[in-house]
């Protein structure tokens, strides 16, 4: 997984027109949760290999793109699939939840475990009055 840091607005829009699948992280250097998320993204990049790109966009360097993407809370995460916003999330996401969302974006959701059958017959005795 490549981490692409601070593409221009034109480069970002080009990625959308090329129908790419990637995670866009809108951040600021002065934002505490953004700094925490950057460590999570580095770990995920190491673990997930070359399956998806992470694009980091500094809101202070690309204010027009930030406004166009309607970023009001940072970090702002956009899960892009085939050039379209599949989902978005505002704020910090723990590693496990972020990784699960990326797997879903890639179509690699883990199988859902079937819950054991816990149905029982109910018998009511007596009428009570």
Language-model features and meaning:
Residues 1-20, 97:
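N-terminal leader/targeting and pre-domain segments
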Residues 8, 58-60, 92, 128:
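Conserved acidic residues
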Residues 22-26, 41, 54, 64-65, ...:
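A short, hydrophobic beta-strand/beta-hairpin element that forms part of a small beta-sheet core
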Residues 26-30, 129:
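Aromatic-flanked redox-active Cys/Sec active sites in thiol-based oxidoreductases
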Residues 31-34, 77:
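The canonical Cys-X-X-Cys-His
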Residues 35-49:
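Typically the conserved alpha-helix immediately C-terminal to a functionally engaged Cys/Sec
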Residues 72-110:
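Non-catalytic, surface beta->alpha helical segment in thiol-disulfide oxidoreductase systems
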Residues 113-128:
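Beta1/beta-strand and adjacent pyrophosphate-binding region of the FAD-binding site
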